[in-house]
């Protein structure tokens, strides 16, 4: 709390909002050349390790080895939109005016442990620049051209997103101009300068 003003409410995925779901219900878009998150989540169990072992504080004597699984913890993940981006949580201006799919996970490429989760590394999967490119690639996500038309359209979208964040007290007004400028530069780079 600063100057008697409470911070904005917390924002996170929740079961009662339908924004936190069992992992098997995730519906990641079928992006060509991209492996979805299916099968890369760790299953966790509560184990029985014997009568002298305390599972609450992980102390005591392990008398049962291998341990006996008692129950499987549910694997829950954030719900995603049609682009594959999380729908809840603190959505920055980059998620509110996206240039691609942003994930908190990544899958290992060819070589060591191919197809396994790549720990602590997220992904950025850019949108196609034009509708023709999107259709040729079979990408279900709208292209930059279809979303924003051109740089001015993107700048308008990201400006609206930044203004909403400022009004929601999730971004400082003094950071707005820099956020818009940086995002517009990223759009120019992502579009290869083709959508002026």
PLM region descriptions:
Residues 1-196:
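C-terminal His-loop and adjacent cap/lid subdomain of alpha/beta-hydrolase
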């Amino acid at each position: 709390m600063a100057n008697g003003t409470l911070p904005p409410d917390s924002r996170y995925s929740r079961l009662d909002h339908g924004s936190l779901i069992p992992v098997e219900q995730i519906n990641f878009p079928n992006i060509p050349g991209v492996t979805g998150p299916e099968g890369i989540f760790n299953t966790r169990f509560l184990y029985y390790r014997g009568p002298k072992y305390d599972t609450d504080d992980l102390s005591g004597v392990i008398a049962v080895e291998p341990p006996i699984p008692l129950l499987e913890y549910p694997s829950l993940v954030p719900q995603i939109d049609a682009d594959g981006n999380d729908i809840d949580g603190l959505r920055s201006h980059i998620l509110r005016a996206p240039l691609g799919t942003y994930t908190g996970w990544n899958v290992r490429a060819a070589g060591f442990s191919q197809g396994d989760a790549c720990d602590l590394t997220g992904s950025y999967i850019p949108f196609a620049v034009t509708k023709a490119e999107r259709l040729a690639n079979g990408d279900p996500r709208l292209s930059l051209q279809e979303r924003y038309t051109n740089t001015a359209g993107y700048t308008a979208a990201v400006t609206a997103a930044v203004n909403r964040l400022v009004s929601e007290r999730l971004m400082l007004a003094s950071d707005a101009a820099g956020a818009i400028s940086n995002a517009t530069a990223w759009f120019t780079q992502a579009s290869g300068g083709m959508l002026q």
